[in-house]
């Protein structure tokens, strides 16, 4: 293992193997402890895309909320459907919701807000690329979730896991923004393992992962966008040796996107990068 890989593995907290029962219990306890330590929390809010990460996070959140209710805490889980117009895989969102069985579900179409934002910027002389418009979608989705959380005295859950965090494969202050990230510490294959244990429909965790943010490249696979497979990313996070080209790609993503894993820099934090 290279020196940088050792640093990354320690930072990303991925275990070489997990016990499904123990991991699920640990994540539920984390969610419950956070809620119990903040008396204002009445809701947990999460956008559901129909993909592996939001399905897993949503299911664990609902299970934690169910236990909190049994313990006398008044709270609920709110799932949010956030299509941009008509979502191609809308049926998978419905399948995920049926599996999660959330207390409450809202639907907010982000298309009018995103299109208006793009138009307003264009009128100001700022022409967004399709990729940049994709980031607008991610930020609008998170804005909606925080608005719902604010309106219901809640918090927003993030779906960031370690295989995503290491590459910075999320929009800064978009899907990367949240109050808590319950599934951080898992890699992609471990997330699949937990969903399989929980009895999720196979197609929800066996589908090709995609952020699906770009109009010009609908359903673009994550692995194609990243230039590396989740198999190699997962192996890297577990401290295994992987092909040199894959390792170099992962480490380039890690270094280039370090700013996404930091809070806003100040004049007191910046000097550490000049040592």
From Swiss-Prot:
Mg(2+) binds at residues 53, 164. ATP binds at residues 47-54, 159, 188, 210. It catalyses: deamido-NAD(+) + NH4(+) + ATP = AMP + diphosphate + NAD(+) + H(+). GO terms for molecular function: ATP binding; glutaminase activity; metal ion binding; NAD+ synthase (glutamine-hydrolyzing) activity; NAD+ synthase activity. GO terms for cellular component: cytoplasm. InterPro entries: NAD/GMP_synthase, NAD_synthase, NH(3)-dep_NAD(+)_synth, Rossmann-like_a/b/a_fold. Its EC number is 6.3.1.5. SUPFAM superfamilies: Adenine nucleotide alpha hydrolases-like. Transmembrane segments: none annotated. GO terms for biological process: NAD biosynthetic process. Pathway: Cofactor biosynthesis; NAD(+) biosynthesis; NAD(+) from deamido-NAD(+) (ammonia route): step 1/1. This is NH(3)-dependent NAD(+) synthetase.
């Amino acid at each position: 293992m290279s020196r940088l890989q050792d640093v990354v593995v320690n930072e990303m907290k991925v275990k070489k193997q997990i016990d499904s029962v123990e991991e699920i219990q640990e994540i539920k306890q984390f969610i419950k402890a956070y809620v119990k330590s903040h008396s204002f929390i009445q809701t947990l809010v999460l956008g559901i895309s129909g993909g592996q990460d939001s399905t897993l996070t949503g299911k664990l959140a609902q299970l934690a909320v169910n236990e909190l209710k049994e313990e006398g805490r008044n709270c609920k889980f709110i799932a949010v459907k956030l299509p941009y117009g008509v979502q191609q895989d809308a049926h998978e969102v419905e399948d995920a919701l049926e599996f999660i069985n959330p207390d409450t579900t809202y639907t907010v179409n982000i298309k009018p807000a995103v299109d208006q934002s793009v138009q307003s910027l264009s009128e100001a002389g700022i022409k967004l690329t399709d990729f940049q418009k994709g980031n607008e979608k991610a930020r609008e989705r998170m804005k909606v979730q925080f608005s719902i959380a604010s309106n219901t005295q809640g918090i927003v859950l993030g779906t960031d896991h370690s295989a995503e965090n290491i590459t910075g494969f999320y929009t800064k202050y978009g899907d990367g923004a949240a109050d808590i990230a319950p599934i951080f510490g898992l890699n992609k294959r471990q997330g699949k393992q937990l969903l399989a244990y929980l009895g999720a429909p196979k197609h929800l965790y066996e589908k090709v992962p995609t952020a699906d943010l770009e109009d010009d490249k609908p359903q673009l696979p994550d692995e194609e966008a990243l230039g590396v497979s989740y198999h190699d990313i997962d192996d890297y996070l577990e401290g295994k040796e992987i092909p040199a080209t894959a390792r170099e790609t992962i480490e380039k993503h890690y270094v280039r996107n370090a700013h996404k894993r930091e809070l806003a820099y100040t004049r007191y934090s910046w000097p550490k990068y000049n040592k």
